[in-house]
From Swiss-Prot:
Catalytic reactions of this protein: (6R)-10-formyltetrahydrofolate + 5-amino-1-(5-phospho-beta-D-ribosyl)imidazole-4-carboxamide = 5-formamido-1-(5-phospho-D-ribosyl)imidazole-4-carboxamide + (6S)-5,6,7,8-tetrahydrofolate; IMP + H2O = 5-formamido-1-(5-phospho-D-ribosyl)imidazole-4-carboxamide
Record's protein name: Bifunctional purine biosynthesis protein PurH
PROSITE patterns for this protein: MGS
GO molecular function: IMP cyclohydrolase activity; phosphoribosylaminoimidazolecarboxamide formyltransferase activity
The organism of origin for this protein: Streptococcus pyogenes serotype M12 (strain MGAS2096)
Biological processes, Gene Ontology terms: 'de novo' IMP biosynthetic process
Lineage per the UniProt record: Bacteria, Bacillati, Bacillota, Bacilli, Lactobacillales
UniProt key word Hydrolase: yes
């Protein structure tokens, strides 16, 4: 009995050659619509779908393959006599191979001129149905959704006249992943259209971006996936201009870096990170000076760090960066001379180019945190804060210079691991206390780091001070200005201590925990 294949594809790459080889192997080919036209024009003889169903394609192509003569031919178990008899009684011929890929829903909704009606029309119904029927019956039917699998299938058919069960099972699994991802995108689109903020089911889909050597540690397996609807301002979308493949830890650090730099749009700014904590932030009127400040903030921790700059990297800045061992540099662009300097004898230095004009769109994405047996979802900590809404709670008001420095410190503290303390002046960070289990411990660490640069320095805390001992430590170090959220039941104790030492202190009313 001649074997039959059904081919209906929107992505026609490689399909003509595939179909020609099938014909050479003695297969009959059923086809639909544009696929049939393409194959016929290439001289590949095909059977029209309506010759199989007895019904013409109708309703602008919405109905063409949803028919028992198709799905019966796909779903009939070859090892079940009752199935084969039912097929014979109803003149249903078996279909042994399905090659289908789906309407380009993803590509459609990414179009700038997308309309709701156009999106709806690009929801494939018949394609997923055929794929699922064939995949369910993979014991007997081979199903192909990816042109990358054409060669494997043809090779096995040529060698043995059929594919192996292992291949059919692997291809079926691929189909179910594919249709699940396809439906997830449709669900995501409609959920957005109706404004549902807390859907009762959450299905998200990502595409494999990079198979990684290992994860956070060598004993951990890891891979990097990118959103099926890519975010332009994302490490996954960055263009790598030089260097080794990004590691798991590189990607996490780089992601933290591009989040931080979003908050420093107004002036040229450089941020240096280690282990997802900023160890140096500098801002100035030009990017070279901003680099100087970021480097001076912690010239020890910068070794092996990640650097992000919010302006084009020029030659002068590149010359200063080049001698230092860095893991990654990220910037919106690089001058030709700067790139030549940075790559000279630095084949491993990872240099990434990222369009910063897409920053705002990245801020609306939800954050997902995996826990054992569950998933936490929250919006990003990107609340717009207006300093005019802040409250000076002490007798002394901040000076103009202190006010500027406090605003700078408040931007920086958002990205320090809790309990987080940061000491800055108005243009660079000076000391950092991160990740301590008590706040006074973070205060002491930050002061120790900044001890030689405390003249005119200010201090920011990501959350309230639970006790006045923090204020005593700060005052003893000579720091005169503090910014914190407030909100402790003992706030008045901290205010009284600040007044006793002549400090100025601002309450913002907004906490910035980071775990």
């Amino acid at each position: 009995m001649t074997k039959r294949a059904l081919i209906s594809v929107s992505d026609k790459s490689g399909i003509v050659d595939f179909a020609k080889e099938l014909k050479n192997l003695g297969w009959d080919i059923i086809s639909t619509g544009g696929t049939k036209v393409a194959l016929d024009n290439a001289g590949v003889e095909t059977i029209a779908i309506d010759d199989v169903t007895g019904f013409p394609e109708m309703m602008d192509g919405r109905v063409k393959t949803l028919h028992p003569n198709i799905h019966g031919g796909l779903l009939a178990r070859r090892d079940a006599d009752s199935h084969l008899q039912a097929a014979k009684d109803n003149n249903i011929e078996l279909i042994d191979l399905v090659v289908v890929n789906l309407y380009p829903f993803k590509e459609t909704i990414l179009r700038p001129d997308i309309t709701y009606d156009l999106a709806v029309e690009n929801i494939d119904i018949g394609g997923p149905s055929m794929l699922r029927s064939a995949a369910k019956n993979h014991a007997s039917v081979t199903v192909v959704v990816d042109p990358a699998d054409y060669a494997t299938v043809l090779g096995e058919l040529a060698d043995a006249g059929q594919t192996t069960f292992e291949t059919r099972q692997r291809l079926a699994a691929k189909v179910f992943r594919h249709t699940a991802a396809y439906d997830a995108l449709i669900a995501e689109y409609f959920t957005t259209q109706v404004g549902e903020a807390k859907p009762e089911k959450l299905t998200i889909t990502y595409d494999l971006k990079q198979a990684m050597r290992y994860g956070e540690n060598p004993q951990q397996d890891a891979d990097f996936y990118q959103k099926a609807l890519p975010t332009d301002y994302s490490i996954a979308s960055a263009k790598q201009l030089n260097g080794k493949e990004l590691s798991f830890n590189n990607i996490r650090d780089a992601d933290a870096a591009i989040r931080i730099i979003r908050d420093f749009k107004d002036r040229p700014t450089v941020v240096v990170l280690k282990h997802m904590n900023p160890c140096g932030i500098g801002q100035a009127d030009d990017i070279e000076t901003a680099w100087d400040y970021a480097y001076e903030a912690d010239p020890v921790s910068i070794f092996g760090g990640i650097v992000v700059l919010n302006r084009e990297v020029d030659a002068a800045t590149a010359k200063k960066m080049h001698p230092i061992f860095l893991e990654i540099i990220i910037a919106p662009s690089y001058s030709e001379e700067a790139l030549a300097i940075l790559t000279n004898k630095k084949k491993n230095l990872r240099i990434l180019e990222l369009p910063f004009d897409a920053q705002a769109a990245s801020e609306v994405e939800a954050e997902y945190t995996g826990v054992v047996g569950g998933l936490l979802v929250q919006n990003q900590d990107v609340v717009a804060e207006n300093p005019s809404d802040w409250q000076v709670v002490t007798d002394r008001q901040p000076t103009e210079q202190e006010a500027t420095a406090l605003e700078f410190a408040w931007k920086a503290i958002k990205y320090v691991k809790s309990n987080g303390i940061i000491i800055t002046n108005d243009h660079m960070t000076l000391g950092l206390g991160a990740g301590q289990t008590n706040r006074v411990g973070s205060v002491k660490i930050a002061i120790e780091q900044a001890k030689d640069h405390l003249d005119g320095a200010v201090l920011a805390s990501d959350a309230f001070f639970p006790f006045a001992d923090n204020i005593e430590e700060i005052a003893a170090a000579g720091i005169k200005a503090i910014i914190q959220p407030g909100g402790s039941v003992r706030d008045q104790d901290s205010i009284d201590a600040a007044n006793k030492h002549g400090l100025t202190m601002i309450f913002t009313g907004v906490r910035h925990f980071r775990h």
